[in-house]
Amino acid sequence: DKPTLIIVDSHIGYGAPNKQDTSAAHGEPLGAEEIRLTKRNLGWPEDAKFLVPDGVREHFEQGVGAHGREEREAWMAKFDEYKSEYPELADQMLKMQRRELPEGWDKDLKPFPPDAKGMGGREASGKVLNAIAPNVPWLIGGAADLAPSTKTRLTFEGAGDFLAGSYGGRNFHFGVREHAMGSIMNGLSLSKVRPYGAGFFIFSDYGRPAIRLAAIMEIPVIYIFTHDSIGVGEDGPTHQPIEHLAALRAIPHLIVFRPADANEVVEAWRVIMQLHHQPVALILSRQALPTLDRAKYAPADGVAKGAYALADASDGKPEVLLLASGSEVSLCVDAYEQLKSEGIKARVVSMPSWELFEQQSQDYRDSVRPPGITARVSVEQASTFGWARFTGLEGERIGMKTFGASAPLKELQKKFGFTVDGIVAAARRQLRRE
């Protein structure tokens, strides 16, 4: 009923007469002569290569190996009894082990109505999470002491807390330790549980080694990072992520989502739950974002392809492309409407996931971002690093080139150029360049 901690007092380079207990045994090969002397020291044949002594082989085959087989057979017998007595629960467990989703897992996902005031990405995600989790019993998680702020607490009846002596709850209290949280989630995922863990985006660096290992192991861990930009406002540059999006996007095999409104959050979660061999980072705003009118603009299910044309020229032949993710998409939509009123044909491309977009066919990518249209502006309240591959070197990239500042969001957006007028001016400059 308790974890087992195994402590092995060891000697690095054990048996090597000249290198045991030295850094040389750690950072470089022993060398042919030291290997020969080590074998002599251990009483092994000096010339044999890749030798496994008979006693060692017997210990593993007849000792450890036999014990493992006996334990597995006993466990399988117990599981057969469990399956007979609780067939539905056993079926759920087998589905979990196969990384399958229960039928109807997304039946409670509903679209959000258009709303100019909208809601924060974190708030929308909390609602979606609580719509999915009751239908996926092995979806469990928590936050690094920030559940109320990240909106990641499961609040439906029976969710409960995972505590010492009470292991049925589904809310984990990881404490203020992002790296430990990420490591715990990796362990849970390797047992086929579907874990999520949340924190402020600025603190993602603390968990980065665990995130990287999840990507190496190809396990579907879900990281929820909120307070995603200078939108944090008065908390200032220590809490305003700048380089963090670029850093996560640089990790191979990690899928990064930064949705633009509540309905993109819904569709991001729909995709996330169906990714069974990749970790995902879901990047969410603190501030409210307008919930776009999907009768007027493109459906949010374009999220599944990583990027899509959200608003377009009436003839489908834009003169300039406005590319953005997350909270800046609605700014681009407003700029699009202003350009439209001036007779300038623009297209707004919402790019919630670069990784998914780059997995699409070349035809699809070209249909969203036509190669012949070189007047391009990207907008993201973060480092512009990486955007050049979508804008081209001649395109304009509106982003953060310094750390942030402590002020209300509107003042910060004006200071750093994240305004409708600034985007419109950039679009005009691009068209003049043409």
Predicted segments with their positions:
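Thiamine diphosphate
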Residues: 1-53, 57-283, 287-290, 361, 368, ...
